[in-house]
């Protein structure tokens, strides 16, 4: 993805100073009581501090990010050591261990932290990744959304274990969508779950193109998406614009489906334009 600058001159300086004020406010508050995940937890906040410290060349902010990271790892490991029922483990991307693992991998890959942090959750990786399979095997698919965050965590790893679990996930999901009763249950999933699964499958296809049936699943979920009742909210409109880019970049997607996606977006744009 190529980033384009959207703020210039005074507005750019104002935006920069505002972000710095946010970082300073975070440093001045005790956030240990919060969840530890990526979207709504301390690993996401830690990433923000690392990025701000690098951008502003502020070692103090970076050290605060490192301290927050060390604290949340210590707390998470303590919870894992005392946990008796791993079915109670929060494996979500937003607040749980999948988001923590993804965040640590991001910091490692971008050289914010040393290799001593690698393999932090090695002992629990199999438990986390297995959950990605079990949620697909559950009769009612009530927790299918959990597979998205775990899958993103698995993709962020460069291990044979994670690739094997992603392969099993694709195989299980492919087998289930072929069943009439199961496909109806998947179609009844939330809009965000369908969007999340499409994006996850696309990322799997890019990183591991040798995993069979991934493209078939992407196309199947695109069909589900095209039949989904759409709202004209700004949030959904933004998601639709993102998906249109995916449609246009994938020549193997059916032409009729592609045209329908464009039609939906054009009509939603007309309806929603005052909200933008």
Q: Where are the regions that the model predicts?
A:
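Glycan-recognition and catalytic cores of secretory/periplasmic carbohydrate-active enzymes
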Residues: 1-276
């Amino acid at each position: 993805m190529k980033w384009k600058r959207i703020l210039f001159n005074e507005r750019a300086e104002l935006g920069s100073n505002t972000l710095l004020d946010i970082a300073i406010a975070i440093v001045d508050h005790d956030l240990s009581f919060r969840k530890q995940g990526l979207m709504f937890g301390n690993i996401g906040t830690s990433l923000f501090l690392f990025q701000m410290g690098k951008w502003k060349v502020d070692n103090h902010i970076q050290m605060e990010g490192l301290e927050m990271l060390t604290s949340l790892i210590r707390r998470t490991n303590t919870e894992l050591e005392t946990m008796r029922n791993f079915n109670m483990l929060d494996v979500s991307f937003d607040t749980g261990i999948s988001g923590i693992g993804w965040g640590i991998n991001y910091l490692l890959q971008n050289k914010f932290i040393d290799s001593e942090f690698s393999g932090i959750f090695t002992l629990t990786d199999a438990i986390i990744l297995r959950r990605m399979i079990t949620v697909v095997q559950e009769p009612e698919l009530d927790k299918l959304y959990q597979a998205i965050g775990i899958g993103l965590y698995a993709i962020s790893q460069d291990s044979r274990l994670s690739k094997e679990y992603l392969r099993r996930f694709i195989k299980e999901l492919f087998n289930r969508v072929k069943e009439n009763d199961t496909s109806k249950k998947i179609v009844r999933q939330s809009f965000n779950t369908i969007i999340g699964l499409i994006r996850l499958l696309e990322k799997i296809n890019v990183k591991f193109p040798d995993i069979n049936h991934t493209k078939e699943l992407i196309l199947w979920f695109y069909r589900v998406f095209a039949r989904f009742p759409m709202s004209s909210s700004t949030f959904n409109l933004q998601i639709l614009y993102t998906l249109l880019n995916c449609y246009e970049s994938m020549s193997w997607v059916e032409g009729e489906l592609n045209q329908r996606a464009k039609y939906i977006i054009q009509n939603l744009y007309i309806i929603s334009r005052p909200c933008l």
